[in-house]
């Protein structure tokens, strides 16, 4: 069985969630089947689409140009990212005509995926609720954890943290459904309470520059000014293989969101960076990340929009060594559960079965 994994996102040195997921899916599938990855590159070029026509199995998110190319092909749609819910938050209650067209196009792609897919992938069980009309079987393939050694040899290249206040790391973007302002307010309050720390936004310019909006950049600039001198941001998106080094030099990973439908159905890809780096997590109630953090003791869960609760959580993790060490131990314990070779097993098993049927 020849497999092609497709993503409309960037795959390269600097990647966001969809590109990271596609590259790891291709890597794991490549251990069992001839596998090709078709993606956008950092210079804006795209891989040759010929592999889409030649494949026996296509795997990818619903996207422009991704469809069954010939009779006999099987197609697996990856629905890990609740795009419709994200767009509704991004465009607000009064979307422009162009935004409405975009939203309708994405809804059409989802409907096509549900009607023609041979197999559907979601990231966790609750996402099944989004697709009650699905005709194909649904399997759960969460996001995964990369090798613990990805960036270990680069630690010496980063500025030393000796003598610096503990870093609270915001590892993702500043999308409309997230809540960076509460993180900023909390870090200001912690410092004003006499506990030194700083908040670092790991990177600001997403690799797929077509998705950048000036207003989002402006909001981040305002937050940086408001939080100075306790809040900083790296000027560029950090290379994927360097992220673990930055996390390991941080004391806490923070990921906060607003109380929206997106929050309930999103898996939070940056959660898995924190698991790989074994850095305790502060996250907002509701959603996969909050449930995992609370159930497995990986950090602290806080109410939405409550900067006081976030500040208390930061102080608790910074001052309570026993709690901090328990979180680190629990992160190390669950890491192997989310290794890419483990989380992709349901997909690999289906493809092995399809291969037997073809033989």
Enumerate the language-model features and the residues they cover.
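Active-site proximal beta-strand in glycosyltransferases
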Residues: 71-93, 100, 121, 139-142
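Nucleotide-activated donor-binding/catalytic signature segment of Leloir-type glycosyltransferases, i.e.
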Residues: 165, 203-206, 212-247
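A short, active-site helix/loop in glycosyltransferases that binds the activated sugar's phosphate group
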Residues: 110-138, 147-149
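Conserved donor-binding/catalytic core segment of Leloir-type glycosyltransferases
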Residues: 4-6, 121, 159-178, 184-187, ...
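Acidic donor-binding loop of glycosyltransferase active sites
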Residues: 118, 245-264, 279
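Conserved acidic donor-binding segment of nucleotide-sugar-dependent glycosyltransferases
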Residues: 295-296, 300-307, 316-321
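A charged, aromatic-enriched C-terminal amphipathic alpha-helix characteristic of glycosyltransferases
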Residues: 305, 322-353
């Amino acid at each position: 069985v020849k497999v092609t994994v497709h993503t409309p996102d960037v795959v390269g040195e600097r990647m966001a969630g969809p590109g990271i997921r596609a590259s790891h899916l291709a890597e794991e599938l490549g251990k069992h089947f001839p596998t090709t990855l078709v993606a956008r590159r950092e210079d804006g070029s795209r891989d040759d689409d010929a592999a889409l026509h030649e494949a026996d199995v296509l795997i990818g998110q619903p996207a422009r140009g991704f469809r069954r190319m010939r009779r006999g092909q099987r197609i697996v749609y990856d629905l890990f990212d609740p795009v419709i819910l994200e767009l509704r938050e991004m465009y607000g209650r009064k979307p422009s005509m162009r935004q409405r067209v975009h939203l309708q196009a994405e809804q059409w792609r989802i409907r096509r995926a549900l009607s023609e897919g041979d197999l559907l992938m979601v990231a966790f069980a609750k996402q099944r609720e989004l697709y009650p009309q699905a005709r194909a079987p649904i399997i759960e393939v969460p996001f995964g954890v990369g090798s613990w050694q990805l960036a270990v040899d680069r630690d010496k290249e980063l500025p030393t943290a000796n003598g610096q206040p503990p870093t609270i790391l915001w590892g993702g973007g500043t999308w409309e459904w997230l809540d960076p302002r509460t993180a900023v307010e909390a870090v200001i309050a912690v410092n004003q309470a006499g506990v030194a720390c700083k908040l670092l936004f790991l990177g600001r310019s997403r690799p797929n520059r077509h998705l950048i909006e000036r207003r989002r950049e402006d909001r981040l600039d305002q937050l940086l000014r408001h939080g100075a001198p306790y809040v900083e941001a790296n000027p560029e998106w950090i290379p994927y293989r360097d992220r673990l080094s930055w996390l390991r030099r941080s004391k806490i990973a923070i990921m906060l969101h607003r109380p929206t439908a997106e929050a309930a159905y999103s898996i939070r890809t940056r959660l898995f960076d924190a698991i790989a780096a074994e850095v305790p997590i502060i996250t907002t109630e509701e959603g996969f990340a909050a449930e995992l953090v609370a159930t497995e003791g990986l950090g602290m869960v806080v109410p939405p929009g409550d900067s006081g609760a976030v500040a208390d959580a930061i102080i608790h993790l910074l001052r309570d060594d026993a709690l901090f060490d328990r979180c680190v131990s629990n992160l190390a314990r669950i890491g192997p559960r989310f290794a890419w070779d483990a989380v992709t097993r349901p997909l690999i098993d289906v493809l092995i079965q399809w291969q037997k049927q073809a033989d």
